[in-house]
């Protein structure tokens, strides 16, 4: 009788241990799901993507986002949230300038959620590029080489709005010199502490652009 009781007690103790482990695991999973929505997580995620982008080539980032589309979606989702706290969004000023002219051919390089296109008159012909997008009108490409999509001297305005990431970002500028028409314009909007302005301006002037 004692043996049966000891055996039953052992079984009940084992079941309780399994149940406690299951509850603890569920609690851990619940805590994790909450944590990924915290401000700290989002800031860390954005910083990690920026660090990766600033130390990698555009071809590497293109492959990364194509293989990890959820990372692209999460990045731009958080970025759209952050924009609500900005005192000014440069995309609005660029749109204002683009709307001064109709019937342009415009290339938006690193278009993100493709918002700029919605702010500009519908008379213009539009090419939107990014590493990845769920928008079927966006061309998934490495913007350092767009020969497959843009002919020489075919674009009136090229836009780089918060998109000069990558160790080879000057290649984007050089490539724009190829497809821009004579007299075409490049619009660049970047944080002052992100890009070496002297290097950017010197490089642009060196390949034939004027300020």
Where are the language model's segments positioned?
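Short alpha-helix
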Residues: 193-211
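A short glycine-rich, Lys/Arg-flanked "PGG" loop and its adjoining helix->strand segment in the class I
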Residues: 170-185
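Short catalytic micro-motifs in class I SAM-dependent methyltransferases
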Residues: 161-163
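Class I SAM-dependent methyltransferase SAM/SAH-binding core
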Residues: 88-92, 96-148
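Terminal intrinsically disordered, low-complexity, charge-rich regions
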Residues: 1-30
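A short acidic, Gly/Pro-enriched loop at the edge of an enzyme's catalytic core
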Residues: 144-158
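Class I SAM-dependent methyltransferase Rossmann-like catalytic core
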Residues: 17, 25-101
């Amino acid at each position: 009788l004692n043996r049966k009781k000891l055996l039953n007690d052992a079984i009940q103790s084992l079941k309780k241990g399994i149940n406690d482990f299951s509850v603890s695991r569920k609690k851990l999973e619940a805590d994790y799901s909450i944590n990924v929505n915290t401000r700290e997580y989002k800031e860390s995620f954005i910083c990690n993507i920026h660090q990766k982008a600033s130390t990698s080539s555009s071809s590497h980032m293109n492959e990364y986002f194509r293989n990890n589309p959820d990372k692209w979606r999460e990045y731009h989702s958080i970025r759209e949230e952050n924009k609500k706290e900005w005192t000014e969004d440069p995309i609005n000023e660029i749109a204002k300038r683009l709307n001064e002219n109709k019937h342009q051919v415009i290339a938006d390089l690193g278009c993100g959620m493709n918002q700029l296109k919605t702010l500009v008159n519908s008379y213009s012909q539009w090419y939107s590029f990014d590493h990845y997008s769920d928008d079927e009108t966006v061309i998934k490409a490495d913007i350092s080489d767009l020969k497959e999509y843009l002919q020489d001297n075919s674009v009136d305005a090229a836009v780089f709005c918060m998109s000069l990431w990558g160790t080879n970002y000057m290649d984007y500028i050089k490539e724009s010199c190829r497809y821009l028409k004579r007299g075409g314009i490049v619009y660049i909007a970047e944080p002052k502490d992100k890009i070496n302005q002297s290097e950017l301006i010197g490089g642009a002037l060196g390949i034939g652009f004027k300020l």
